[in-house]
Amino acid sequence: MAGWPTGVAAVTLFVEDVAVAKEFYERVFGLPVHYADDVSAVYAFGGTLINLLARSEAAELIDPAPVGTSGARMQLTVAVEDVDALCAELTGRGVTLLNGPMDRPWGPRTAAFSDPDGHVWEIAH
């Protein structure tokens, strides 16, 4: 198929409180803000932008689909060199792990945690 995308440009996560989400992402990921206004904050995460958007603004992007409330409906996985070391660093930053570190039957060593709005992040090697 000609012109098929070669990467994900941005992921938009709908959040209840942009300030709370910003504090979490800056503390946990240590990323500088790429762009911010009253209803959003954008971070450059490798080659992908992570956009934290106030849930109140989400309908404009996805209408006519309904805006979901809460709960894990997807997981974002980030490749890391040392899952155990990063887990120790994350817990030192106040992050509660959902699971792991553990060796998965299909090969990788993983651990997972969620942000204040329930978006699940997995680290894997």
Which residue stretches match the model-derived regions?
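Vicinal oxygen chelate
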Residues: 1-9, 31-78, 87-114, 125
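Conserved active-site tyrosine of GNAT-family acetyltransferases
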Residues: 21-25, 90, 118
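Amphipathic alpha-helical segments
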Residues: 17-32
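Polyanion-binding surface elements
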Residues: 12
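Short, conserved charged micro-motifs
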Residues: 20, 82-87
